[in-house]
Regions:
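Short alpha-helical transmembrane segments in multi-pass integral membrane proteins
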Residues: 1-23, 81-148, 190-245, 308-373, ...
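Residue-level signal for short hydrophobic patches within transmembrane helices
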Residues: 16-35, 39, 62-69, 145, ...
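Transmembrane helical elements of multi-pass membrane transporters/channels
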Residues: 21-40, 142, 176, 205-209, ...
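Helix-terminus/linker motif at the lipid-water interface of multi-pass membrane proteins
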Residues: 35-53, 123-130, 186-193, 255-285, ...
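Small-residue hotspots at the loop-to-helix junctions and early N-terminal turns
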Residues: 50-61, 136, 140, 199, ...
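Small-residue-rich hydrophobic transmembrane alpha-helices
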Residues: 53-113, 150-169, 282-340, 344-346, ...
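Hydrophobic transmembrane alpha-helices of multi-pass small-molecule transporters
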Residues: 65, 180-184, 210-214, 292, ...
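Short runs within selected transmembrane alpha-helices of multi-pass transporters and secretion channels
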Residues: 74, 143-161, 169-177, 198-213, ...
Length: 459
C-alpha cells in the first residue's frame, strides 16, 4: 500500500461507506440549493397566484444558464482536481481550483451585465406573454445582482466535495437556503413587497452561501493554496471546460428545450381551452417538481465523482466497477420512490405552488403525470451520462447529453405540438425519456466492457 492511498481514503475505504459519506451531504446540498427557486415559486404562487408562477418560469432560463456555466466549471474542475490527486500532481490540482474561482467570478459578472442590459428582449425570447412580462421583469431584474454569488455557490461547491468535505459544502448551501426560506415570507407578506421581495430574499441568501464557501479556501486538506494559484490559466480553463462539458451541455440543452417549450406552450396553449398563461405556469411548476428529482440524482453522482475520478486516475479499476454497480442500484431505488410519489399525488404537488381555477388544476394534473411518467428510469440515464466525464471521457458524455435534449426531446416536442397541439406537448417528455434510456444504457454497457476489472500498479 503506497503513501497516497494511506493519506486518501478514496483509494482504500469501503465503497459503500464512501458513497454514503459523500453522496448524502451532496444530495441534501443539491435539494436545498434547488429550494432557492422552488421556495420563491411557492411563496410567489401563494401571494400572487399562477401568473407569478408563470413569471418565475419565464425567468428561470437565466438561472439554468448560470447553472450550466457554474456546473461546467465546478464539475470540470473537481473532476480534474481528483484525477490530478490520483496521479500525485498536487500543484496541478491547486492551479485548476484557483483558475476555477477566478473563472466563476468573471463569468458571473459578464452574465449579470448581459441580463441587466437586455432584460426585456431576453424575457420575450423566453416566452413571456403580455400579462407575464411585468412580473418576470421585476423578478429577474433584481435576481440578476445575485448572479456572481450564485455562480460561486454552484461552481465552488463541487471543489469542496472533491476535497472530501461534503458536509461543509452541504452546510454552506443549507445556510443560504434556510435564510431564503425565512426572508421570503417576511419580504413577500410581512413587508408586502410581493415578487421583488422574493427576488431580494434570493440575492441575500446567495451572497451568504458564496461567502461561506469562499471561507473554506484556506481550510483545504489535500492541498495548500498559494496566491499565485488564483489566476486565469487558459490551459487549465481548457481542461476544466472539456471535463465539465457534459454538465454544461446537459444544462444548456435543458435551457434551450425549456425556452422552446415555453414558446410552444404560449403558441399552442392560446389555441386550446387553457389559454397561454395556464400551460406556461404549469410547465414551470412541474419543472420545479422535477428539479427535486434531478437534485437527488445529481447529488448521488457528485458524491460518487471523487471516488470514480481518484480510482480511475490511480488505475484501481475494480473500485470503479464496484462504485458504478452500487450507484446504479441506489439510483433505481430512489428514482422509483420519487416516481410513486409524483404519480400518486400530482394534485397536491401542484396545489403547493399556489391557487388556480379548475382548468389550471385539470391541465396541471395531466401534465405532471405525463411529464414525470418515466422518472424511475430517468435517474439511470443521468447517472450514465455524467459517469464518463468523471473518468475523463468528456466527449462521450457530451454526446449522450446532446442526444437526449437536442436530438430526441426537441424534435419530438416540435413534431407532436404541430400535430396535436398542446396535448402533444404533454406526451413529448415520456416518449423522449424512453428513447434516451435505451441509447444511454446501450452505450454504457459497451464502454464498461472496455474498462479492466482488475487493478493496475501506478508507477
Amino acid at each position: 500500500m503506497n503513501v497516497e492511498e494511506k493519506q486518501n481514503p478514496l483509494g482504500i475505504e469501503k465503497i459503500g461507506t464512501l458513497l454514503r459519506k459523500m453522496a448524502i451531504p451532496a444530495i441534501i446540498a443539491n435539494v436545498v440549493n434547488a429550494l432557492y427557486n422552488i421556495v420563491d415559486q411557492i411563496f410567489i404562487g401563494q401571494g400572487v397566484g399562477y401568473l407569478g408562477n408563470a413569471a418565475t418560469n419565464i425567468a428561470f432560463p437565466i438561472t439554468t444558464i448560470c447553472m450550466a456555466i457554474g456546473l461546467m466549471v465546478g464539475i470540470g474542475a473537481a473532476s480534474n482536481f481528483n484525477l490530478a490527486l490520483g496521479r500525485k500532481e498536487d500543484k496541478h490540482a491547486r492551479e485548476v481550483a484557483g483558475t476555477a474561482v477566478v473563472l466563476l467570478v468573471t463569468a458571473g459578472l459578464i452574465i449579470m451585465s448581459v441580463v441587466l442590459l437586455f432584460l426585456q428582449p431576453l424575457l420575450n425570447l423566453f416566452g413571456a406573454t403580455d400579462q407575464i412580462l411585468g412580473y418576470a421583469s421585476e423578478y429577474a431584474g433584481i435576481t440578476a445582482f445575485g448572479i456572481p454569488f450564485f455562480m460561486i455557490s454552484i461552481g465552488f461547491n463541487p471543489l469542496v466535495r472533491a476535497d472530501g468535505r461534503a458536509t461543509y459544502s452541504m452546510m454552506a448551501i443549507i445556510v443560504g437556503a434556510l435564510l431564503n426560506t425565512v426572508l421570503d415570507p417576511l419580504f413577500i407578506f410581512g413587508f408586502i413587497m410581493g415578487i421583488p421581495g422574493a427576488a431580494w430574499a434570493t440575492v441575500i441568501s446567495q451572497v451568504v452561501s458564496a461567502i461561506v464557501l469562499l471561507a473554506y479556501i484556506p481550510r483545504f486538506r489535500s492541498v495548500r493554496f498559494e496566491r499565485s494559484d488564483f489566476k486565469l490559466s487558459f490551459s487549465d480553463v481548457k481542461v476544466i471546460a472539456s471535463l465539465g462539458l457534459t454538465s454544461f451541455i446537459f444544462q444548456i440543452s435543458a435551457t434551450i428545450v425549456q425556452i422552446a417549450s415555453n414558446n410552444l406552450l404560449r403558441t399552442y396553449g392560446a389555441q386550446s381551452i387553457y389559454g397561454s398563461d395556464i400551460p406556461i405556469a404549469v410547465g414551470g411548476v412541474v419543472s420545479k417538481i422535477f428539479v427535486i428529482f434531478i437534485a437527488v440524482v445529481i447529488g448521488l453522482n457528485q458524491g460518487a465523482q471523487p471516488i470514480l475520478g481518484f480510482n480511475y486516475g490511480a488505475k484501481k479499476y475494480s473500485r470503479v466497477h464496484e462504485t458504478m454497480s452500487l450507484l446504479l442500484k441506489v439510483t433505481v431505488i430512489l428514482s422509483t420512490i420519487l416516481w410513486i410519489l409524483f404519480e400518486a399525488f400530482p394534485l397536491q404537488l401542484i396545489q403547493m405552488f399556489g391557487s388556480g381555477d379548475a382548468l389550471y388544476y385539470e391541465f396541471g394534473v395531466r401534465y405532471a403525470r405525463a411529464f414525470l411518467f418515466f422518472t424511475f428510469i430517468n435517474g439511470t440515464t443521468i447517472i450514465v451520462t455524467t459517469f464518463f466525464p468523471a473518468i475523463g471521457k468528456a466527449k462521450l458524455g457530451a454526446i449522450l447529453s446532446l442526444t437526449r435534449q437536442m436530438f430526441v426531446l426537441l424534435p419530438v416536442m416540435i413534431l407532436l405540438a404541430t400535430s396535436f397541439g398542446v396535448d402533444g406537448l404533454i406526451f413529448a417528455g415520456p416518449i423522449s425519456d424512453f428513447i434516451s434510456f435505451i441509447i444511454c444504457i446501450t452505450v454504457y454497457i459497451h464502454q464498461m466492457r472496455k474498462i479492466p476489472k482488475v487493478d493496475e500498479l501506478l508507477v
